[in-house]
């Protein structure tokens, strides 16, 4: 009889998709945090529903690949992410302020303000959304925001970590606008706030694409960033520019070195950090038919700790190419000299 109820079918599907969300990103666990709080606070009768427990089991089964992989790899994924956050540490109000400013920009400033307006209206008793979905949405979103805000008091975190919660809170914005601008006489009104939000999005995309392609906005803020070795340092837009330009120039240097007998055609490449390691692998090493290896601890090279082994790992006595960018420069002598007889 339980499976004949439409509600329970949806509950089981929710368990499946929640499990897939957690399989994609650990923060998907906040879905079950929100649901658990909702059941405890407002719907305890669900504790008598077998489908609730079955839904939890379905989510847990989805996580089995993650659990098995971590068991086989000393739980390195859990420890890595655990080190990125923490409950204790020295108080840094500037980190918290940076988080708020980052959220404001990442989530579209107009949307951020509209979200605050909608939340304030709800706190004052506005009735533009039914009470049950209001409670569930708040419990699904607010815990994540509060937890990451707490982390940001003691360490630097990334503003997009709270983005899933802010996306969910946009339901309140939509409900408030729908209540304010109800359709009358088949007339269709686009609220000015929606036009403003869309305009900010379009402006940001156009400005960003133009800056990435042309660099017309000078983002070299220090004298060091104007030198040859450090040119562009601090310009985050360079992360998405110029990767396809590297291979042709490197190919000329590589061909000459092979012709002169300095390097061999089979010599592979190394890099020191997961970024730009993967970029150089995709745009340079792979097209040239050579392997790219990470050359540091797993915390620095991430997945390449395993990719290295799949490719045969670094070999003693072999020569390797090393590429580094001026905007993210790594001094070869500082990082590589202890491991190589000669750097040229």
Residue ranges of model-derived segments:
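Transmembrane-lumen/periplasm boundary regions of multi-pass, lipid-linked membrane glycan transferases
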Residues: 20, 31-134, 140-155
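Luminal/periplasmic acceptor-recognition loop/helix of membrane-associated glycosyltransferases
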Residues: 232-234, 238-344
């Amino acid at each position: 009889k339980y499976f004949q109820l439409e509600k329970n079918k949806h509950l089981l599907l929710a368990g499946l998709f929640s499990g897939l969300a957690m399989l994609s990103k650990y923060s998907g666990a906040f879905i079950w945090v929100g649901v658990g709080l909702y059941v405890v606070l407002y719907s305890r009768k669900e504790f008598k529903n077998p489908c609730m427990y079955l839904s939890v089991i379905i989510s847990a089964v989805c996580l089995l690949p993650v659990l098995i992989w971590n068991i086989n790899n000393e739980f390195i994924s859990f420890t890595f992410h655990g080190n990125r956050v923490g409950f204790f540490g020295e108080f840094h109000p500037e980190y918290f302020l940076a988080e708020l400013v980052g959220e404001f920009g990442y989530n579209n400033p107009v949307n951020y303000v509209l979200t605050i307006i909608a939340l304030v209206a709800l706190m004052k008793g506005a009735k533009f959304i039914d009470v049950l979905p209001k409670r569930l949405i708040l419990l699904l979103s607010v815990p994540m925001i509060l937890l990451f805000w707490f982390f940001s008091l003691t360490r630097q975190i990334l503003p997009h970590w709270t983005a899933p919660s802010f996306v969910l809170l946009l339901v309140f914005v939509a409900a408030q606008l729908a209540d304010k601008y109800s359709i009358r006489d088949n007339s269709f009104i686009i609220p000015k706030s929606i036009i403003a939000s869309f305009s900010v999005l379009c402006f940001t995309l156009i400005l960003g694409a133009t800056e990435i392609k042309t660099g017309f906005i000078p983002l070299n803020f220090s004298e060091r960033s104007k030198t040859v070795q450090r040119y562009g340092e601090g310009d985050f837009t360079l992360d998405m520019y110029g990767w396809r330009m590297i291979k042709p120039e490197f190919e000329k240097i590589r061909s000459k070195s092979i012709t002169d007998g300095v390097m061999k055609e089979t010599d592979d490449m190394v890099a020191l950090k997961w970024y730009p390691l993967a970029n150089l692998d995709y745009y340079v090493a792979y097209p040239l038919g050579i392997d790219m290896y990470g050359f540091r601890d797993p915390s620095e090279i991430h997945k390449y700790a395993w990719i290295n082994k799949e490719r045969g790992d670094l070999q003693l006595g072999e020569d390797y190419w090393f590429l580094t960018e001026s905007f993210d420069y790594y001094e070869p002598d500082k990082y590589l000299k202890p491991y190589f007889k000669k750097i040229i």
